[in-house]
UniProtKB/Swiss-Prot annotation:
Gene (name only): clpP1
Subcellular location: Cytoplasm
Keywords: Cytoplasm, Hydrolase, Protease, Serine protease
Protein name: ATP-dependent Clp protease proteolytic subunit 1
The UniProt record lists the keyword Cytoplasm: yes
Entry superkingdom: Bacteria
EC identifiers of the protein: 3.4.21.92
Molecular function in Gene Ontology: ATP-dependent peptidase activity; ATPase binding; serine-type endopeptidase activity
Subunit structure: Fourteen ClpP subunits assemble into 2 heptameric rings which stack back to back to give a disk-like structure with a central cavity, resembling the structure of eukaryotic proteasomes.
Major place of residence: cytoplasm
Active site as annotated: 97, 122
Protein species of origin: Nostoc sp. (strain PCC 7120 / SAG 25.82 / UTEX 2576)
Job description of the protein: Cleaves peptides in various proteins in a process that requires ATP hydrolysis. Has a chymotrypsin-like activity. Plays a major role in the degradation of misfolded proteins.
Chemical reaction(s) catalysed: Hydrolysis of proteins to small peptides in the presence of ATP and magnesium. alpha-casein is the usual test substrate. In the absence of ATP, only oligopeptides shorter than five residues are hydrolyzed (such as succinyl-Leu-Tyr-|-NHMec, and Leu-Tyr-Leu-|-Tyr-Trp, in which cleavage of the -Tyr-|-Leu- and -Tyr-|-Trp bonds also occurs)
InterPro entries attached to this UniProt entry: ClpP, ClpP/crotonase-like_dom_sf, ClpP/TepA, ClpP_His_AS
Organism placement in taxonomy: Bacteria, Bacillati, Cyanobacteriota, Cyanophyceae, Nostocales
């Protein structure tokens, strides 16, 4: 994938930034692919940088992801909770599986979705192979992650743990309005005023 370059004029001449570096200057982090350890390390590094730069200003995490590794995603989640700024989460396109979990983990009142996005929750996927003892170990690990994710989803949404467990047994897709009613997000957003801060500031 070709990454766009942004050219800026300043008193010192022209400066070139890749689009993600330019967005980072506005405290915008973009999670736009499947979550794996490499992506998680990049997201964590950006969150830590923005925390060090200004611990008082919000960070905007835009999510368009089909999900991915639970352990990698939990690294992002733990960092979101570890740093001092509020992390505003915004779904644009798709937030599925770990993507939906991270969307729900944003600061309360600052979890959002654009109007035509889709949001999906389900249980962790597993493909255990090998000897019986190895399969048993992997199965226990999957059940551990399932319980942890369900507990956090119940905390994020306010839903009873029994409903979370039932709804995540299969792929459970929601529109933004349905996700708002469910408690995964706080608002569905569209336009923002010209010249304002990024759309994630709406409602603050």
């Amino acid at each position: 994938m070709t990454i766009p370059i942004v050219i800026e004029q300043s008193g010192r001449g022209e400066r070139a930034f890749d689009i993600y570096s330019r967005l980072l200057r506005e405290r915008i982090v973009f999670l736009g692919q499947q979550v794996d350890s490499n992506l998680a390390n990049l997201i964590v590094a950006q969150l830590l940088f923005l925390d060090a730069e200004d611990p008082e200003k919000d960070i905007y995490l835009y999510i368009n992801s089909p999900g991915g590794s639970v352990t990698a995603g939990m690294g992002i989640f733990d960092t979101m909770k570890h740093i001092r700024p509020d992390v505003c989460t915004i779904c644009t396109g798709l937030a599925a599986s770990m993507g939906a979990f991270l969307l729900s983990a944003g600061a309360k009142g600052k979890r959002m979705s654009l109007p035509h996005s889709r949001i999906m929750i389900h249980q962790p996927l597993g493909g255990a192979q090998g000897q019986a003892t190895d399969i048993e170990i992997q199965a226990r690990e999957i059940l551990y992650h399932k319980r942890r994710l369900n507990d956090y989803l119940a905390e994020h949404t306010g839903q009873p743990i029994e409903r979370i467990a039932e709804d995540t047994e299969r792929d459970f897709f929601m529109s933004p309005d349905e996700a708002k009613d469910y408690g995964l997000i706080d608002q569905v957003i569209d336009r923002h005023a010209a010249g304002s801060r990024p759309v994630a500031m709406v409602g603050q």
